[in-house]
A protein has these predicted regions:
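Terminal substrate-recognition subdomain of acyl/acetyltransferases
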Residues: 9, 14-77, 175-198, 203-206, ...
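Conserved Walker A/P-loop ATP-binding site and its immediately adjacent core
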Residues: 151-169
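N-terminal pre-P-loop "Q-motif" helix
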Residues: 88-116, 612
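Pre-Walker A (Motif I) flank of P-loop NTPase domains
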Residues: 111-120, 149-150, 366
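Walker A/P-loop NTP-binding motif
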Residues: 129-145
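Conserved beta-hairpin
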Residues: 127, 364-383, 389-391
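Walker A/P-loop nucleotide-binding motif
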Residues: 117-130
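Conserved acetyl-CoA-binding loop-helix of GNAT-fold acetyltransferases
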Residues: 130-134, 433, 441-457
Length: 679
């Protein structure tokens, strides 16, 4: 590469740096730490040669040492290979040959109730995706001969992640003399078809949970897929290939390596074949450029090693809240930086080089950490300053639909709730990423970190703190709600990768400035959700809905609301609840009104249903799920659910309509039922 001298380079904005500018900061505020790190790492690399191209002056001589020419190993194809020799001849390394051999096991369908999984792991540049593509071609060829029609599926974060895999599927099929038809999504191949006999399709991760009839499934970069989706795929398919990168931004996060892989190994009904590809395709093992790349971009960053002494410090709450000097932290404190970023690499976050660049260079981004008293970082947090927007920009958002770059919470609050004053507040902090050391989960460290951040925010006069826009699940949502963060926005569509809805939360720090606004936004959010549960959120998990509908400190949506029921509706409700001749289907209108009353007045009344009772009325009444589906989601028998719902409705009738015993008109109904039964 030919960069300008560092003294000039740090005065220029790259395209990436231009893309991270926000209204509150101009070009002069952009930091250039990533360039400086890149330059310093290059100058400190033994085998790097640097020349001033203007003067032909050698700026840095390489230290070559005893350099041996690299010769790729000779490839030996197994004599008794079951895949076609034409496939094996496309392999570039012996490692790839052995990986192909490992995947031959997938040719046989496992016995009923059993599963066969192949797990391939590798660093970047080992040809992992390529060899899986060739294996799929070979498997499709063999299975077609056995069963005539083959349906294989490939899933990953997005179609671009499987472009190499699909490229080698095509190469493999052509080597086996097939003519292929391709379908594209943009420039990416998403489907490979051979006549009416072979179908190999890209399918989004969450959609795999409703797929049927796939002979073999490939999960590429499995560490980037949420664990619930991985468990769902495992439960649904008997032959699966999981591929994951060891180091790198797609890195095998601990969720995959410690939890999911452990689960596979311990499952008695699953045979697991593991293989690690170590041999690079284009260069020698231990190549210095690869080492430099990993080091510079923190691809191999790992969190601190945790010892028994560290657990003692945690038990004694021996913590330090770290407010680093960003220049010193990013450019001179290598050990702390690697610990900090290593937590992200090993956590559930999906990292790209741009994430490191944003953290280092974006003028509105900053970091905080929680360390033990011995200096080991145990919680990493990246934050962004938001708010303080001028009237002109706010007007463009309101009138012209302008999207405020780098100001997610103000943008959504203006667009969805019309609260323009919120964007003018002196400022807020949005937590972009918060992650706890993977070995120290569920020890209260995340909550401790939030408390420290909130203390600092109060001292600095910050108006609010926003929670990240994350894929909502019950455990994560409970963490934020337990710490006082209120939902203020939710996406109307599930994330195609995780299958989760993205939620934004906020917590007022300065009650006078942000408190009323955030409480109002939360009430509007709850009202929107309550009235959308038969629409875009009809399949949201009931426990998640229940938490999102939480009333905040006695902040009911409509405390004076009374159920709008006619006398006839009341009679049907009572007949249904007390076991009279009335079904749920004949009483849905009245039951729905009663349940809506509960949530509109929630926080103002003394009635508080048990949590599971709330999930019952959410799932069956507000989301209007069929009996069979509702029973499955709630983990009940259909008959049990039907009886339980009657009891819940009876409780609501007793509170809101003041029926405390069987009504007079029901007595005659009950008597007539008994007479009919006696006949």
């Amino acid at each position: 590469m030919i960069p300008p001298p560092l003294s000039e380079w740090v005065k220029q904005l790259t395209k990436f740096q231009q893309s991270i500018l926000v209204p509150q900061y101009g070009p002069d505020h952009v930091r250039h730490f990533l360039k400086v790190r890149f330059w310093n790492k290059l100058m400190n690399m033994n085998k790097a040669l640097a020349i001033n191209v203007d003067s032909d002056e050698v700026v840095k001589e390489p230290v070559l040492g005893n350099v041996q020419p690299w010769k790729p190993k000779e490839i030996v194809i197994p004599e008794k290979a079951r895949f076609s020799r034409a496939i094996y001849e496309l392999a570039k390394t012996q490692d790839q040959v052995e990986a192909l051999r490992a995947m031959e096991v997938l040719m046989e369908r496992p016995p009923r109730g059993k599963k066969v999984n192949v797990v391939l792991i590798a660093d970047r540049g080992r040809g992992k995706s390529a060899i899986i593509g060739l294996a799929l071609a070979a498997l499709a060829h063999r299975l077609r001969k056995v069963k005539g029609r083959v349906r294989l599926a490939v899933t990953a974060m997005n179609p671009s992640n499987v472009s190499t895999l699909m490229e080698f599927v095509v190469k493999g099929l052509k080597a086996l003399n097939y003519d292929v038809d391709l379908s594209y999504w943009g420039s990416d191949v998403v489907s490979v078809k051979v006549g009416v006999s072979i179908f190999i399709d890209y399918i989004r991760p969450y959609d795999m949970l409703s797929e049927e009839g796939r002979d073999i499934v490939v999960v590429d970069e499995a560490a980037m897929i949420p664990l619930p989706v991985l468990y769902g795929i495992h439960g649904r398919f008997s032959r699966v290939i999981y591929a994951s990168t060891i180091h790198g931004y797609e890195g095998a996060g601990r969720g995959f390596s410690l939890r999911f892989l452990k689960f596979l190994r311990e499952d008695r009904d699953t045979r697991v074949i593991e293989y690690e590809l170590k041999e690079p395709i284009r260069y020698a093992l231990g190549d210095p450029v690869e080492h430099w790349l990993f080091d510079t971009l923190l691809l191999d960053a790992e969190p601190a090693k945790i010892t028994n002494e560290d657990y003692d410090l945690i038990n004694k709450r021996g913590f330090n809240y770290v407010i680093p000097d960003l220049k010193e932290f990013f450019l001179t404190n290598e050990d702390q930086l690697r610990q900090f970023f290593g937590i992200y690499v090993q956590a559930h976050y999906r990292n790209e080089p741009d994430d490191l660049g944003m953290m280092m260079d974006a003028p509105h981004h900053f970091i905080r950490a929680l360390s033990l008293n011995n200096g080991k970082i145990v919680v990493s947090v990246e934050l962004a300053e938001e708010g303080g927007i001028n009237d002109e920009l706010i007007d463009l958002v309101v009138r012209g639909g302008l999207k405020l770059p780098g100001n997610i919470l103000p943008d959504r609050i203006i667009k969805y709730w019309g609260l323009t004053e919120f964007a003018k507040l002196r400022g807020g902090w949005r937590i972009i990423r918060i992650a706890t050391h993977p070995e120290l989960q569920d020890k209260g460290l995340g909550t401790e970190m939030l408390r420290k951040i909130e203390e600092e925010a109060r001292e600095r006069g910050i108006d609010w703190i926003g929670g990240v826009g994350f894929g909502v699940n019950a455990k994560l949502l409970n963490f934020w709600i337990r710490n006082g963060y209120m939902p203020v926005h939710i996406s109307p569509e599930r994330n195609p990768i995780s299958g989760e809805y993205s939620v934004l939360l906020a917590k007022p720090i300065n009650e006078a400035a942000g408190g009323d606004t955030i409480i109002y936004a939360n009430k509007e959010f709850r009202l929107r959700l309550l009235n959308s549960l038969q629409g875009p959120f009809h399949d949201m998990e009931p426990d998640v809905v229940r938490m999102l509908l939480t009333d905040w400190g006695g902040q009911p949506l409509d405390p004076s609301y009374s159920p709008r029921l006619t006398d006839a509706q009341v009679r049907r409700l009572v007949a249904y609840s007390w076991g009279g001749p009335m079904t749920y289907e004949n009483t849905t209108d009245a039951i729905t009104e009663l349940v809506r009353t509960y949530y509109l007045r929630k926080g103002a009344d003394s009635i508080e249903l048990p949590l599971f009772y709330e999930e019952v009325i959410i799932c069956k009444v507000l989301q209007a799920r069929p009996w069979k589906e509702a029973a499955r989601v709630l983990g009940l028998r259909k008959s049990t659910l039907m009886l339980l719902l009657r009891e819940v409705v009876k409780l609501l009738i007793q509170y809101y309509i003041k029926y405390t015993e069987i009504p007079e008109f029901m007595i005659s109904v009950t008597k007539s039922q008994r007479k009919g039964q006696s006949r």
